[in-house]
Amino acid sequence: MNYRWFMLSILLLLTTHVQCQMVMPQALKAGDTIAIISPSSSPDSMTVTKGCAALREWGYKPVVGPNALKDYHGFAGTADERAADLLWALRDSTIKAIMCSRGGDGGVQVLYRIPLEEFTRHPKWIIGFSDVTTLHSAEAVAGVMSIHGSMCDGIAAKGERDSVNAILQRLLRGRLPVYQVPRHSLNQLGEATGILLGGNLSVFSGLAGSDYDFLNRADEGLILFMEDTHESMSKVDRMLHQMEIRGVLSKLKGIIVGHFSKYKYPENGFADMYEMLHEYLQHYDIPVCYDFPSGHHSRYNFPLVIGGRVHLRVGQDSTRIEFIE
């Protein structure tokens, strides 16, 4: 046997094994620093100010990235400037977590400017949703967990969002969430345990075939979470077909469907997005939870650990989602 080829094969096996083991970033403590960056669209400065105030109330020290408030053709600076802020937040040892100011567009421009090894070397919670799915995907491929959750506007909100923010605060301190939500008439019953990956459907669909495509890990037994906004039923249908053609859907162990908002309905005879999704997903013998309160919603965006091991039980009366150490 060729010795060099043998050693290369062993190295590849070891690398694959390491990547399958998702790393949980360290829990935060009072006084820790959280960086606020803008990897996508330019944020409203007042929203960032309110987000900083909320983090201080939580007991943390917020620090805003050098380019986070810039506006360059709608983005928060050039792609290089946004990438520089992310690298700064990852590499600075005094920064313990990273919160994105907002989503929007443009996160994909940052991805190929950041070597995946940077996420592995500096495992930190990256918090956000929507277009921040790009960073969740990169961390997942690099073997690091992240948080699909509220950003500056969400954490600054009071009233109905208090319960959501309380869960995010506990999660940052190391307490994994357990959710029990009411049944939905379209739910598919069953139980499954696997690694939770996902986020904004249109964003992670746009990464298909790239080095940042977490669906390449479908063989590992994934539970997929998806949500979206401003996408028509026909476009979502096309994204599902794309996953089916790739052979991804048949490998999933379960699906959690979050909020789908701001789309035209009824369309093509379907009353709403969930009905269209059910028409498609009912042919797979896996548990499916509909209308989980996470994603683009004016009130509820409960945090999820992307890359975390989760037990999903979809029962007759309710759905239980428990993250496992």
Q: How should these model regions be labeled?
A:
Residues 262-325:
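ATP/nucleoside-binding phosphotransfer catalytic cores, i.e., glycine-rich phosphate-binding loops
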Residues 20-94:
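ATP/NTP phosphate-donor binding region
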Residues 33, 42-48, 54, 191-231:
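Conserved beta-alpha junction segments in alpha/beta enzyme cores
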Residues 103-121:
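Short Gly/Thr/Asp-enriched flexible loops that form oxyanion-binding sites at enzyme active sites
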Residues 116-139, 145-151, 287:
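Short, acidic/small-residue loops that bind anionic groups at enzyme active sites
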Residues 145-212:
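Conserved anion/nucleotide-ligand pocket segment
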Residues 1-22:
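Bacterial Sec-dependent N-terminal signal peptides
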Residues 215-273:
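Internal helical hairpin/lid segments
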